[in-house]
Amino acid sequence: MNILKLTPSCKDYLWGGSRLRSDFGIKSDLNPLAEAWVLSCHPDGPSYLADGTTLADYVTAHPGCLGTDCEKFEQFPILTKFIDAKNNLSIQVHPSNEYALKNEHQYGKTEMWYVLDCEPGAFLYYGFDHEISKAEFEERIKNNTLTEVLNAVPVHKGDCFFIPAGTLHAICKGIVIAEVQQNSNVTYRVYDYGRVGADGKPRALHVEKALDVTLRTPPVKHDFGSHLAQGCLLYTSPSPRDSTSSR
């Protein structure tokens, strides 16, 4: 099989910067250049072959190109993108497969981040710093105090984070990330710093759905690998099944 060179679909979300173009060679006239979907069969941002064929159409026409391990999936299973966060992304959550298939007619979204680069002092939000009730979660969204109870995690170049569906999170300013995720584009935004979109209106929030799917038990921090130069740090979120009773 020949190697296929893909052209990404790019996004100009308002929090983006220019480093994907200047530092990573992504060709796009968009400004800002927030994301490049470099391996994607999703209709919201497909990757393209040199002849203009989408990767999704190519995979459909050549079902054996992915080998036998992917045959059990109904669609191309992953989406890979580069993200340049010049400013904070919204605080958001992605639903599980079960919830998304029922309510959005597509799969949910679990994702993984690899930090390609970051500014000194950069951090991201990952879950809550203590368990909170659904009522408190909703109230803090309403009064703009949600960040007071979030887990702020310092990041460094080379760090890797696993973000299970249901984990409230946000990539914050000064971070460039490579993301591998499920082939989904379902995001429930709960806080956006009062920003407005290109139409001059506040960007939509999705509070009710976020209340349904967010895990409100804090992630567990694991330190290990002390014999390594920088050690290892792992955060794990409780499973949705374990947290159902406390939502």
Task: Label each residue range with its predicted role.
Residues M1-I132, D192-G231:
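Transition-metal
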Residues M112, A170-Y193:
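A short hydrophobic beta-strand segment most commonly corresponding to one strand
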